[in-house]
């Protein structure tokens, strides 16, 4: 039997946040840099203190580094500014913001364990709750607790005051709240020195990224980047930002060398976006290596990696070797996407011990299949985000990481490595002919371009860059070219295009849209020109009702069965897959129409309602409706946003609410309510509402019950819920509309 060959493991963590400022000296509109530094970034880097042989690889995007440095000084975000504000001076808007945003934490691990936080949560999400239902001390305690629970417990030894304040539990003073924010500054101050220490000790390696996290394959060759997309926008065919791609890499190298005191040898391209053009750029800047997804290798080799029922590779050899590009000489290592996905998505559902043991066993399976390899050295790359998954673990994943690192450290046949050191010693790299333009997501860029709203954002960016280039040709005096170019680079970042359109939903899309357009406007300001007025128009449909394309009367048969030709003439809206890591959509398609007397709906159920008949799961959907053509008593949506910022549609008020509840095989009685004074709802007689459930759900509601007269417009939207907890909108963040025929 062949002896086991040593397997090297490269743990790689990507740390990135977009710029949350309107300009370079303003407060941050979102707190995520500050919070993730205390909860994830610094604790992850400090893991190396616990294990003498542990080596980790980190990609810290330059914009994140600068933001962390900013927070180590006097920078504030809206959350921290409100935390250190005297509650006696808080305005109604301040209080509304706190109630809508200071519960943005994972409920099970960050809210429920703390009695006072849980008490405030339950109070906030009780029916008919408003800002005046909370005392000044409630606001003081809520702001304090929100910030305290975002500090990882691994930092308590360095900051014992955090634990004391958590144990106090309530009645926080202004002095204590200011102290909490001061602790955040001290945490931020530790970040860069910790990185430098582990760099010196050869326990960490840092990788470069273009400064503002742009997707370089799109910027350098739009035609290649649009391959394998569902739709291609021909108006973007002339998009070319190759010059900016080069400048963003150059700026990142200069800044990173200044902050960390050394030149980086490796890179993590944003969204693992690589192409031949990108490799050429890296070669030009003497970047020795980059990371890509296993799907990119599969496409380049025209080779499918086959996995067994447990997800283990049948033949891991090709994925466990570093490659060198024949055309550029740049080394490429490819991550095992299955293992990275398990850490991101599956292992949070395990106990830390079981998760670590499962990962260890999968690593050992890979190792066992390499005994017949012709080579002695092999590299397993596990690469993932440094923040997104850890809140779903107990103790922010620290127990899991401690255990897997311990198992590896105690196994003489395994080792963790710094990538540059490994590549320097590896003499048997495989050659690769050409890399196809691809990302970590399905080998294409569908999540950032191709969807109509995303394409519109790219069009805005393309047009503004063209304007800027033309303005610069004038060489007029008074232009601040440096700041204008920074604003342009910032708008080239991938995050804008990730959140625009389908399928992703931040819960704060309206803020991202506002920031994107404001930064584009600032380019013209720094160049001394007026900005084009189209930049005042939101790219996203926030609360603007859609136009009904069918305005003639249709009376469909109420059968609940697919075969019904009348519905073929109705308005239909396809519901895309829901936001990543959120609940599944309840419906694939929604059709609607009207005749002179009734409003009709047909709901096509998605696969998520299929279930084990022994344990049926109750699904709920709310329909909110109003008539914008006349004055009506209206009440707010009474659904809970458990962890998200409030979306614009949730701030609207409506005249009627219909709740539909079902399992796979059973329809429960509907609840029909009408808005009454003081923002309340009263149950109405629903006998005249028809509802049939077989293959689909058919609903017919008399217009009279909705206070919609002939010629009036009915606006409506749907919300999937889990017992009153808002799961997703259908469609996302827009309202549909239809006119009652005259």
Segments from the language model and where they lie:
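Short, well-ordered beta-strand segments enriched in hydrophobic/aromatic residues
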Residues: 209, 560, 598-607, 697-703
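Extracellular/luminal beta-rich ligand-recognition
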Residues: 562, 610-696
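Active-site and substrate-binding clefts of carbohydrate-active enzymes
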Residues: 4-165, 306-552
């Amino acid at each position: 039997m062949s002896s086991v060959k040593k397997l090297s493991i490269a743990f790689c963590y990507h740390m990135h946040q977009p710029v949350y400022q309107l300009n370079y000296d303003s407060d941050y509109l979102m707190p995520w840099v500050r919070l993730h530094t205390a909860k994830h970034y610094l604790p992850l880097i400090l893991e190396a203190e616990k294990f003498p042989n542990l080596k980790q690889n980190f990609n810290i995007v330059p914009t994140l580094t600068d933001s962390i440095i900013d927070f180590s000084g006097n920078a504030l975000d809206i959350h921290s500014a409100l935390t250190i504000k005297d509650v006696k001076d808080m305005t109604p808007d301040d209080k509304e913001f706190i109630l809508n945003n200071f519960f943005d934490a994972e409920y099970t691990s960050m809210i429920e364990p703390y009695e006072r936080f849980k008490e405030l949560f339950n109070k906030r999400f009780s029916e008919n709750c408003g800002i005046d239902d909370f005392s000044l001390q409630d606001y003081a305690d809520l702001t304090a607790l929100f910030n305290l629970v975002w500090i990882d417990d691994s930092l308590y030894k360095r900051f014992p005051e955090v634990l004391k304040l958590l144990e106090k539990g309530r009645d926080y003073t202004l002095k204590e709240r200011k102290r909490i924010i001061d602790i955040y500054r001290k945490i931020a101050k530790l970040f860069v020195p910790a990185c430098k220490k582990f760099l010196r000790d050869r326990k960490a390696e840092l990788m470069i990224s273009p400064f503002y996290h742009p997707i370089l394959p799109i910027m350098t060759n739009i035609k290649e980047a649009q391959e394998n997309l569902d739709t291609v926008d021909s108006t973007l065919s002339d998009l070319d930002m190759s010059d900016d791609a080069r400048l963003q890499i150059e700026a990142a190298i200069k800044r990173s060398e200044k902050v960390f005191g050394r030149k980086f040898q490796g890179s993590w391209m944003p969204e693992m976006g690589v192409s031949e053009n990108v490799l050429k750029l890296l070669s030009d800047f003497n970047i020795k290596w980059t990371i890509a997804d296993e799907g990119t290798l599969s496409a380049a080799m025209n080779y499918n990696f086959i996995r067994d029922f447990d997800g283990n590779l049948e033949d891991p050899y090709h994925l466990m070797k570093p490659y060198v590009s024949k055309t550029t000489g740049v080394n490429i290592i490819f991550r095992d996407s299955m293992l990275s996905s398990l850490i991101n998505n599956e292992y949070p559902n395990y106990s830390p011990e079981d998760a670590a043991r499962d990962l260890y066993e999968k690593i050992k399976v890979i190792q066992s299949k390499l005994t017949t390899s012709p080579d002695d050295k092999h590299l397993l790359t596990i690469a993932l985000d440094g923040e997104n998954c850890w809140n779903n673990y107990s103790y922010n994943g620290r127990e899991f990481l401690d255990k897997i690192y311990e198992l590896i450290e105690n196994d003489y046949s395994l080792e963790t490595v710094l990538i540059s050191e490994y590549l320097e010693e590896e003499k048997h790299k495989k050659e690769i002919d050409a890399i196809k333009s691809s990302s970590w997501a399905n080998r294409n860029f569908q999540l950032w371009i191709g969807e109509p709203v995303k394409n519109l954002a790219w069009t805005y960016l393309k047009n503004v860059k063209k304007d800027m280039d033309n303005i610069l040709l004038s060489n007029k005096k008074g232009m601040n070219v440096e700041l204008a170019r920074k604003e342009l680079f910032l708008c080239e970042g991938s995050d804008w295009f990730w959140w625009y359109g389908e399928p992703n939903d931040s819960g704060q899309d309206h803020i991202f849209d506002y920031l994107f357009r404001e930064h584009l406007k600032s380019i013209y300001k720094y160049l001394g020109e007026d900005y084009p007025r189209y930049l005042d128009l939101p790219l996203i449909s926030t609360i603007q009702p859609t136009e009904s394309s069918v305005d003639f009367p249709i009376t469909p048969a109420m059968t609940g069965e697919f075969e019904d030709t009348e519905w073929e003439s109705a308005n239909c809206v396809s519901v895309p897959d829901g936001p990543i890591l959120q609940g599944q959509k309840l419906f694939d398609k929604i059709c609607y129409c009207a005749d002179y007397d009734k409003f009709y709906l047909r709901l096509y159920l998605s696969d998520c309602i299929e279930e084990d008949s022994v344990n049926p799961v109750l699904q709920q959907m709310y329909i909110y409706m109003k008539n914008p053509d006349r004055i009506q008593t209206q009440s707010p949506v009474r659904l809970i946003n458990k962890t998200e910022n409030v979306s614009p549609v949730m701030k609207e008020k409506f005249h009627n609410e219909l709740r539909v509840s079902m399992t796979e095989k059973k329809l429960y009685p509907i609840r029909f309510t009408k808005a009454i004074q003081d923002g309340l709802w009263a149950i109405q007689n629903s006998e005249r509402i028809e509802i049939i459930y077989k293959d689909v759900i058919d609903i017919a509601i008399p217009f009279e019950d909705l206070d919609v007269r002939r010629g009036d417009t009915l606006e409506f939207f749907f919300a999937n819920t889990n017992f009153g907890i808002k799961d997703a909108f259908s469609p996302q963040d827009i309202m549909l509309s239809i006119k009652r025929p005259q």
